[in-house]
Amino acid sequence: MTDNRCSDGVSSKRDSALTLPEDLSPLELELTCIWKDIHYEIIGRIRYKYLEGYYRNQWLLANSKGQYKWLLEAYALYAIVDFEGEKIDYSLLKNQEPGNLIGLSNNQSYSLDAISEFKSYMIEGFTPVMLNNIKGVISLELSTTKFDWATIDIDQKQNALVYFGEIVDLKDLNFNKFRQLNG
C-alpha cells in the first residue's frame, strides 16, 4: 500500500501493487531528470484512462526546493506542465471542437487538439491532489506551433482549470535511466 498525502492533509491508501495494463511507459517512480538546470525526481504518477480507451500518465516531479512540475505523457508525446492550474471561464469553452483556436490568459491562441472524458485512474507513489470526484472530468488538450502546451480540465460543476507548459523531447530531460520493457 502507498500513502498518498492529499492537499487537504488527508492520506488515502492505494494499492501500489496493482498492475497497469498496457503500461508501455519508459518512466517509473524514483527516476531522476534535469529540466532547465534543475534536478527533479519522479515521486508519483496518476494514470488516467479515458472513455475513448487510451491512457495518459501524469508524472509528478519534485526538486530539492520542494517545487513541483507535472510531466504529461500521452501518445508518446511529453510536456512539462505547471503544477498549479489557473481558473478559466467555462463559458469560453462551450461548443468548442477539435481544430478550433482558443485564446488564453497568457495572450496566446492554442489549437484544440482533443477533447476527452476520464473513465478511471490509478495512483502510484505520492500525489498531493484529491481525486475523489474524477468521474465526468473533461480534458481539453491544446498546443501551438511554438511547442507550447496547455491542458484544460473541467469538472462536473463546470469549474475549469488550465495548466500551461511546453512540449519536450524525452531525451532532453537527461533521465538517469529508463524502465526496461519486456517484449
Predicted regions span which residues?
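Short, surface-exposed polybasic-aromatic patches that bind anionic ligands, especially phosphate groups
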Residues: 4-27, 31-183
